[in-house]
Amino acid sequence: MNTTFEATNSKSRVLIVDDNSRFARSAQLFLEQTGNYFACALNDPRRALETARSFKPDLVLVDLIMPQADGLEVATQLEADWALHEVPIVFVTALITPEEARNGRRINGHRVVPKPTRGFDLLKVVEENLPCCSGT
């Protein structure tokens, strides 16, 4: 299936890759309701590279543990793609505690967010990791 995404002017684009459709959809809706983001929720990590090439995200949120492909595999594919290798990736997982996340826990150099997470906490992480907003 070939998906075309509309231009979104100044809105930042966030790709959410998570096999939990409820989490992915609620994160998408929360980010879009701020008015600052255009988000795409994807439940099949095997389609992450193809979707990212089409969607052209400014940031990718990816679940670490998924049955079809894990988040590390998705990150490796994105980092190997010349057009996507600089896109920030944030892992979302139930494998760490909120305290570990607050202490700056990283996996393969990527920020990690604990699951479950509140919408405003997720928004803060998105804002901190977007190239336009992070001050880097």
Residue spans for each PLM region:
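Conserved Asp/Asn-Gly motif in the active-site loop of CheY-like receiver
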Residues: 42-46, 119
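Active-site beta3 strand of CheY-like receiver
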Residues: 55-61
